[in-house]
């Protein structure tokens, strides 16, 4: 089995080596093959040269590079299109998403074949500036009022999906997506 790790990057030259090192320390606990798909979203720093160098040293590291910044959703979609793994995870390169959780997420999917996805959610806004917390809460209240699909407050992009879920997402025809709502 292979796990594709999709990592959107925008001006993350310093975070990339730290992320890769942290993931390498965790992947041996899972025992599946890994492929990393970094998506450079039009960075203006040294993100692209860092990705080139890492890819030249590590055969399981691949990257895509956008000519300009198209946004995280476009980067995620491009990564999903490129991923070939039996399982696919989406992670932030700045280690907001603890790589150790991937071990638990994979174990949960392995022991529950009826599940297509295991996701994460933020349970507290502690440490967040009050104004950001206010607008985040307001966003979820508004979106749940106008949408037919309920969004869980604190939903994160960090999730582990089976291939069949990825294929279903790729079939969604909407151009402007919000992956936390999928």
Language model features by range: what are they?
Residues 2-4, 35:
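Cell-envelope/extracellular polymer assembly enzymes that use nucleotide-activated donors
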Residues 4, 40-43, 65:
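Structural signature of the Rossmann-like NAD(P)-dependent dehydrogenase/reductase core
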Residues 12-27:
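Short, well-formed alpha-helical segments that are part of the catalytic scaffolds
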Residues 18, 22, 46, 50-53, ...:
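Alpha-helical transmission elements in cytosolic ATPase-linked domains
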Residues 34-38, 48-82:
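Conserved donor nucleotide-binding strand/loop of the catalytic core
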Residues 40-49, 95-96:
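A conserved acidic beta->alpha catalytic loop
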Residues 64-68, 72-82, 87, 99-181:
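Acceptor/aglycone-binding surface of glycosyltransferases and processive sugar-polymer synthases
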